[in-house]
Regions:
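A short SAM/SAH-binding and catalytic strip from SAM-dependent methyltransferases
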Residues: 144-155
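A short acidic, Gly/Pro-enriched loop at the edge of an enzyme's catalytic core
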Residues: 130-145
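Class I SAM-dependent methyltransferase SAM/SAH-binding core
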Residues: 86-134
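Core SAM-dependent methyltransferase catalytic element
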Residues: 210-230
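Conserved class I S-adenosyl-L-methionine
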Residues: 175-202
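A short glycine-rich, Lys/Arg-flanked "PGG" loop and its adjoining helix->strand segment in the class I
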Residues: 158-173
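Class I SAM-dependent methyltransferase Rossmann-like catalytic core
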Residues: 2-79
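Phosphate-coordination loops involved in phosphoryl transfer and adenosine-cofactor binding
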Residues: 82
Length: 230
């Protein structure tokens, strides 16, 4: 191992691995004419695949908005309208870009690297190159926070939840979707426990909970929690 690699932080190593996956695995699928995730057409009611790369990217983004609502058991398609919505760790999937919010924000520590790689869509969304544990936004100013398949990627999951609660207005909604009981990896270093995550929500009201039989990653399984701020 080269000397400089030995002294690099775990966060830097994790970031390199994240970027490599998006560039070497995810983006080639889209450029080859596919979708990743592969259920985009079902979520878009059978809409035929777009002819262009950018068109497919926007289809992925719009499907991601529908996916979040469906998984959270939110039937109102206008749920995000006129709200301030924050997505924690969106990557380049495009949820912040397609979300029909009054203000749509992606908190993504790799935002600049995604932009440099031309993986971010051109939209009105704001991407903050910030950690989930220290978001540069004022307390009690956000209506909805989404963290889909990102809680086990952050540096400190409990601190990320505390930060989300700081940001939410009274009555605000936190939508979590995360793997539990999985083997830690360089990009997903935390083996989360559903009961422990619930304990971090403390005074919040659980509005919806779902336990999947499959994971986002390689093993374990996913849990969906939708919680309301008091």
């Amino acid at each position: 191992m080269r000397l400089h690699e030995r002294f690099r932080s775990p966060a830097a190593i994790k970031g390199d691995a994240e970027i490599a996956w998006w560039l070497r695995v995810w983006d080639p699928i889209v450029r080859a004419g596919g979708f990743s995730p592969g259920d985009v057409q079902q979520l878009l009611d059978g809409e035929p695949p777009a002819d262009s790369y950018q068109g497919r990217r926007w289809q992925l983004a719009r499907a991601e908005v529908r996916r979040v609502l469906r998984e959270a058991n939110i039937e109102d398609p206008s749920f995000f309208h006129e709200k301030v919505v924050v997505d924690i760790g969106p990557g380049p999937l495009g949820f912040p870009d397609a979300c029909p919010a009054r203000v749509s924000i992606g908190v993504e520590p790799l935002a600049q690297r995604f932009a440099d790689a031309r993986l971010l869509l051109d939209s009105h969304a704001v991407y903050l190159a910030a950690r989930a544990e220290a978001v540069p936004l004022v307390s009690n100013t956000v209506d909805v926070i989404v963290a889909r398949n990102s809680l086990d990627h952050v540096d400190d999951p409990r601190a990320a939840i505390a930060e989300a609660r700081r940001l939410l207005r009274p009555g605000g909604t936190l939508i979590l979707n995360f793997d539990v009981e999985h083997t830690p990896t360089p990009t997903e270093p935390h083996a989360l426990d559903a009961d422990e995550v619930r304990s971090w929500l403390s005074a919040m009201t659980i509005a919806h909970e779902d336990v999947w039989d499959h994971p986002h990653g390689h093993d374990g399984h996913a849990v969906v929690l939708v919680a309301r701020q008091p």
